[in-house]
Design a protein with these regions (language model features):
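Bacterial N-terminal signal peptides that target proteins for export
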Residues: 1-12
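Bacterial N-terminal signal peptides
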Residues: 11-20
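Preference for long, amphipathic alpha-helical scaffolds in soluble/luminal domains
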Residues: 2-4, 22-321
Length: 321
């Protein structure tokens, strides 16, 4: 049942992965990058709209729904088709947990449904938030589990149901504390170990953004922002796992806007006149879409991180929505 308009907080939109097949990289045609951002935004929106109906899954699924919704390009027909696909998937799963070990399956689907305008707490009679009630289950997926659970639960202020007997009750306070406990000594967050990664740091900041006024959270955020500023490349972009790529730029843009920071103007994130938006648009392709990196082309994936990243940046810069 549709229960609300398709809108999500800008900070939420860290979710979408920017991966696509594309042709020739587009080139900036205005010094401030405004026209490049606008063209990349519009062309990639058209590209995504032309793809097949979204499924349940990381590729061609929730990230596409979220991106199209944020860009106000998600049609009623596509939203309804996606919701029905999720209903069928949930019925087949036969559990409030969509995966026995990956809580992010629930988190991602909650985000997709909410973006499409549906109540994730009632999907064919199943409350998908009930799959996130056990902290031990979330913790089993490492850093990702608590981060995405908090983002999903906060995306529409979902109540957290009571956990089953013998489980460790999930609370927002507990999730924040868990995420803070993962912060590395250099100020960032890592997928594993103590060597920080730009993507994980940006995701953690996005999840913590609604709590940034709390003293311990603010201290962690300030340290992480210093880490990200130091990690930024001379062209405004970012690297992850040893390679400059579009996803890292997009993740940072969304994290900054979630925190109320203008990624196009904040001096900490403008290097040699180039911002993260310039870094992102360096991967834009003529005709729509973004490539993963200069070396890697991924024909099986669709560009779905562009709408939140460029929309968030444009909202604080020269482009209009």
């Amino acid at each position: 049942m549709k229960v609300w308009k398709r809108s999500l907080p800008v900070w939420l939109l860290t979710l979408v992965m920017l991966l696509t097949a594309c042709g020739t990289p587009s080139q900036p045609d205005q010094p401030d990058g405004t026209e490049t951002w606008r063209e990349a935004y519009e062309e990639t929106g058209a590209y995504l709209q032309a793809q097949t109906a979204p499924t349940v899954g990381s590729i061609g699924g929730e990230w596409a729904v979220i991106g199209l919704s944020r860009a106000r390009l998600l049609s009623d027909e596509t939203a309804q088709s996606y919701e029905q696909t999720v209903e069928d998937y949930v019925k087949q799963a036969g559990s409030v947990r969509l995966h026995h070990a990956k809580s992010t399956e629930n988190s991602r689907t909650i985000l997709g449904l909410t973006a499409a305008g549906y109540n994730a707490a009632n999907v064919a009679g199943v409350d998908l938030t009930a799959g996130l009630t056990d902290m031990a289950y979330l913790r089993a997926q490492g850093t990702n589990g608590p981060i995405w659970a908090l983002i999903a639960l906060d995306c529409h202020g979902y109540d957290i149901p009571q956990c089953a007997d013998g489980e460790e009750q999930t609370t927002r306070e507990g999730l924040v504390a868990e995420i803070l406990s993962y912060q590395c000594s250099d100020g960032g967050w890592a997928l594993m170990g103590d060597e920080s990664d730009v993507d994980m740091t940006a995701m953690a900041l996005t999840s913590l953004a609604p709590y940034q006024e709390e003293t311990d959270v603010k201290a962690a955020v300030d340290t992480a922002l210093t880490y990200l500023s130091d990690a930024q490349q001379a062209d405004g972009g970012f690297m992850s796992w040893g390679a400059a790529n579009s996803e890292s730029c997009a993740q940072v843009i969304v994290a900054l806007t979630a925190l109320g920071i203008d990624p196009a103007a904040d001096s900490r994130f403008v290097k040699n006149g180039a911002s993260p938006l310039d870094g992102l648009c360096a991967f834009a392709c003529e005709g729509g879409g973004f490539r993963h990196s200069d070396e890697v082309w991924l024909p099986s994936r669709a560009s779905t991180h562009w709408p939140p990243a460029t929309a968030s940046g444009r909202a604080r810069h020269a482009c209009s929505t």
